[in-house]
């Protein structure tokens, strides 16, 4: 189905109407070297899970188990970027993107997670990187974005074993050697403070192990030790530090790139204005954000975690502390929403400890029956644009103003089977969301925060993990029924005009800064 001329006329006037109702913002509000891009991951985009020598990942296995994914779907095809990357790069170039953040599939490079290299995988990523650069787009490469080679999970338990530290370092070095002459931005691991509790506390992500009470009933292994999430996280941190050390010792001076870690970073507000609730905010920040950032800045875990967890939190020797400390050139921040935090036990099912039960903090999106922000198509994600400024300025103050890249930010809409294509394309709420977030981010930069980039999640609608294809974040609509055809949404129009300094791409933000 093609988008009609009438549809574009309607979208154009919708955008004009949006402008009239909403201080002016365009790319000129940001530093001249500020990097705008979109973000993706291998499992969510590539497809081709059994082609050209790729080995299975833990996500390949999980999605073929009944009841794991909301719509019983999988990433076997996803958006088929493995075959359609040139088409997608043309879309990126048409938008005027500076960079494209994608991840490398570990099991496409090393089908068994270690050992023999799959040269077809090397060739694919070489072709992708070269095509991006030929179109003026910088590759921003993540080494691990949730999809662990299944062979490593089966062999020794994946992130629960210290063996993974050397295997990750070896895999990272293969990538530095093969692609580093052209890749100037590396991320070691994406959102360990999310995939670790999802995989080892509540059992929704691989390897579906449950350490928390009332966790996922489909856990492969229930009643696991409550120390497991912290052990897995410890090995993630040491693997990260080992990869950074290898990059700095052998490649960084020659290749001239930078390397960092990407963290999930919601902001939190106290449910009530009381010392107890403000303490709850500090505590959830310790158990979420600071769990991974304190070690790479200060060389140890937050004191709050040490006091509450005792021997369940691994010790860090002075040697390991020195290796961890300063193991980043930038911090990647993935920010989507803001929630209320409270120490009060739940009175309604909306309150939850969920991923961080040891914090004894309950999170909610409501106070006295009023949402913290507009609801979105995904439960737990609310529109609170000022949160991006607050989390950035918190990181600035707490960690002495490190370089920050907003590695993901996006607006989810639910897939409604009754929605027409035209309704799906008219995503005015997504435009307002990004416009307002960028206004607050611009304010944070003006206040002195060293933010260098902003990546929209995502270029395309894609496979959204346990939600399957029921949630859409893309600037482009993807028809998953009819050959993954891409259709530009109104937000793609707006982002193109915003990036190309077109006056019609300027928006008026409802924010008051």
Swiss-Prot record:
<feature type="binding site">
    <location>
        <begin position="190"/>
        <end position="191"/>
    </location>
    <ligand>
        <name>a beta-D-glucoside</name>
    </ligand>
</feature>
<feature type="binding site">
    <location>
        <position position="336"/>
    </location>
    <ligand>
        <name>a beta-D-glucoside</name>
    </ligand>
</feature>
<feature type="binding site">
    <location>
        <position position="145"/>
    </location>
    <ligand>
        <name>a beta-D-glucoside</name>
    </ligand>
</feature>
<feature type="active site" description="Nucleophile">
    <location>
        <position position="408"/>
    </location>
</feature>
<feature type="disulfide bond">
    <location>
        <begin position="210"/>
        <end position="219"/>
    </location>
</feature>
<feature type="binding site">
    <location>
        <position position="408"/>
    </location>
    <ligand>
        <name>a beta-D-glucoside</name>
    </ligand>
</feature>
<feature type="binding site">
    <location>
        <position position="457"/>
    </location>
    <ligand>
        <name>a beta-D-glucoside</name>
    </ligand>
</feature>
<feature type="glycosylation site" description="N-linked (GlcNAc...) asparagine">
    <location>
        <position position="223"/>
    </location>
</feature>
<dbReference type="InterPro" id="IPR017853">
    <property type="entry name" value="Glycoside_hydrolase_SF"/>
</dbReference>
<feature type="binding site">
    <location>
        <begin position="464"/>
        <end position="465"/>
    </location>
    <ligand>
        <name>a beta-D-glucoside</name>
    </ligand>
</feature>
<comment type="similarity">
    <text>Belongs to the glycosyl hydrolase 1 family.</text>
</comment>
<dbReference type="GO" id="GO:0042802">
    <property type="term" value="F:identical protein binding"/>
</dbReference>
<feature type="signal peptide">
    <location>
        <begin position="1"/>
        <end position="23"/>
    </location>
</feature>
<comment type="subunit">
    <text>Homodimer.</text>
</comment>
<feature type="binding site">
    <location>
        <position position="44"/>
    </location>
    <ligand>
        <name>a beta-D-glucoside</name>
    </ligand>
</feature>
<feature type="binding site">
    <location>
        <position position="473"/>
    </location>
    <ligand>
        <name>a beta-D-glucoside</name>
    </ligand>
</feature>
<dbReference type="GO" id="GO:0047782">
    <property type="term" value="F:coniferin beta-glucosidase activity"/>
</dbReference>
<dbReference type="Pfam" id="PF00232">
    <property type="entry name" value="Glyco_hydro_1"/>
</dbReference>
<protein>
    <recommendedName>
        <fullName>Coniferin beta-glucosidase</fullName>
        <ecNumber>3.2.1.126</ecNumber>
    </recommendedName>
</protein>
<feature type="glycosylation site" description="N-linked (GlcNAc...) asparagine">
    <location>
        <position position="447"/>
    </location>
</feature>
<dbReference type="InterPro" id="IPR001360">
    <property type="entry name" value="Glyco_hydro_1"/>
</dbReference>
<keyword id="KW-0326">Glycosidase</keyword>
<keyword id="KW-0438">Lignin biosynthesis</keyword>
<comment type="function">
    <text>Involved in the release of monolignols for lignin biosynthesis. Unable to hydrolyze 4-nitrophenyl beta-cellobioside or alpha-linked methylumbelliferyl glucoside.</text>
</comment>
<dbReference type="InterPro" id="IPR033132">
    <property type="entry name" value="Glyco_hydro_1_N_CS"/>
</dbReference>
<feature type="active site" description="Proton donor">
    <location>
        <position position="191"/>
    </location>
</feature>
<dbReference type="GO" id="GO:0009809">
    <property type="term" value="P:lignin biosynthetic process"/>
</dbReference>
<keyword id="KW-0378">Hydrolase</keyword>
<dbReference type="GO" id="GO:0005975">
    <property type="term" value="P:carbohydrate metabolic process"/>
</dbReference>
<keyword id="KW-1015">Disulfide bond</keyword>
<keyword id="KW-0732">Signal</keyword>
<keyword id="KW-0325">Glycoprotein</keyword>
């Amino acid at each position: 189905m093609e988008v009609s001329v009438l549809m574009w006329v309607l979208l154009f006037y919708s955008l004009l109407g949006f402008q009239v109702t909403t201080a002016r913002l365009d790319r000129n509000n940001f530093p001249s070297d500020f990097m705008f891009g979109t973000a993706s991951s291998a499992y969510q985009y590539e497809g081709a899970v059994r082609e050209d020598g790729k080995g299975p990942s833990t996500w390949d296995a999980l999605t073929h188990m009944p009841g794991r994914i909301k719509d019983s779907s999988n990433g076997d095809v996803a958006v088929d970027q493995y075959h359609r990357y040139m088409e997608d790069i043309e879309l990126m170039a048409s938008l005027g993107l500076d960079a494209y953040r994608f991840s490398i599939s570990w099991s496409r490079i090393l089908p068994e997670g270690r050992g023999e290299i799959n040269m077809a995988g090397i060739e694919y990523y070489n072709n992708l990187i070269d095509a991006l650069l030929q179109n003026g787009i910088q590759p921003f490469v993540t080494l691990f974005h949730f999809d662990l080679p299944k062979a490593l999970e089966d062999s020794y338990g994946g992130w629960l074993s210290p063996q993974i530290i050397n295997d990750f370092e070896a895999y990272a070095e293969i990538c530095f050697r093969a692609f580093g002459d052209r890749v100037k931005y590396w991320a070691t691991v994406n959102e360990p403070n999310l995939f670790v509790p999802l995989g080892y506390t509540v059992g929704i992500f691989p390897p579906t192990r449950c350490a928390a009470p009332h966790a996922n009933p489909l856990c492969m292994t229930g009643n696991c030790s409550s120390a497991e999430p912290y052990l897995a996280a410890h090995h993630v941190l040491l693997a990260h530090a080992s990869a950074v050390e290898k990059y700095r010792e052998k490649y960084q001076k020659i290749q001239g790139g930078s390397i960092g870690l990407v963290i999930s970073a919601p902001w939190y507000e106290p449910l009530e204005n009381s010392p107890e609730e403000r303490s709850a905010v500090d505590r959830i920040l310790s158990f979420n954000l600071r769990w991974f950032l304190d070690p790479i800045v200060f060389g140890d875990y937050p004191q709050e975690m040490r006091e509450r967890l005792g021997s369940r939190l691994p010790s860090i020797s002075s040697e390991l502390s020195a290796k961890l400390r300063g193991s980043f050139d930038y911090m990647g921040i993935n920010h989507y929403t803001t929630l209320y935090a409270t120490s009060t036990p739940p009175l309604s099912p909306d309150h939850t400890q969920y991923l961080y039960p040891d914090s004894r903090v309950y999170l909610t999106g409501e106070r006295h029956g009023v949402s913290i922000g507009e609801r979105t198509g995904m439960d737990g994600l609310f529109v609170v644009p000022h949160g991006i400024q607050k989390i950035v300025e918190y990181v600035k103050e707490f960690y002495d103003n490190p370089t920050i890249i907003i590695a993901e930010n996006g607006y989810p809409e639910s897939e409604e089977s009754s929605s027409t294509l035209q309704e799906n394309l008219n995503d005015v709420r997504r435009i307002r969301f990004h416009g307002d977030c960028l206004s607050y981010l611009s304010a944070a930069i003006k206040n002195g925060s060293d933010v260098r980039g902003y990546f929209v999640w995502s270029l395309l609608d894609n496979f959204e993990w346990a939600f399957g294809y029921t949630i859409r974040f893309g600037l482009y609509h993807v028809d998953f029924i009819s050959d993954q055809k891409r259709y530009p949404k109104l937000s793609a129009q707006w982002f193109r005009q915003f990036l190309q300094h077109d006056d019609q791409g300027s928006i008026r933000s409802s924010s008051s800064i």
